[in-house]
Amino acid sequence: MAPKAGYFTPLLHVMDVRRSIRFYELLGFDLIDLEGDPACPGWARMHCEGGAVMFLLAEEPFDPTKHALLTAMYAPDLPAFREHLLANGVAVPAITYPGYMPSGSLSLRDPDGYIIDIHHWSDAEHTAWLNNVEQKKKDGVLPSSRYSRTQLQSYPIRDTL
């Protein structure tokens, strides 16, 4: 068997690690590890259900809008999640209903300017996605994988929040 890597985790350069921790806690992340001075850490790792993120203190100012990074998260109740963020002082736009995510989506920026798309993932969309994956496998568009339909039932957030 060929060696492989696993557990892909974005590492974001940030201007203030503590500020990023506070913001990502509002998104449901838990602080897992911290390096450096606890008052002004140089690195942190946070986990949420189904994902992780790390922060590295930037040595000089940078423009995150020039980085080609877009993150996506899923919420089982996007309107309630939006209200939670608003109640905690986060500037959150209205929910939109684009064709690729008809049950709702919003985009916001974290304190360093990184874009975070948050999508409502409904039962109907999840079932349609599972059916689409199965059909692509039958049509030979996707290879058979080690992930069965049952294993994919829990992706991305089914019954975990």
Each language-model region and where it sits:
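A short beta-turn/loop motif at secondary-structure boundaries
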Residues: 37-38, 61-63, 98-100
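A sequence-level detector of short linear motifs
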Residues: 54-55, 117
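Core segments of cupin and vicinal oxygen chelate
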Residues: 2-4, 11-53
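A short local loop/turn or secondary-structure capping micro-motif enriched for an aromatic residue
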Residues: 61-65, 124-127
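Vicinal oxygen chelate
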Residues: 6-16, 44-47, 62-161, ...
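Short, flexible, solvent-exposed loop/turn segments with mixed acidic/basic and small polar residues
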Residues: 1, 59-62
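Residue-level structural signal for beta-strand termini and adjacent loop
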Residues: 37, 58-59, 119-121
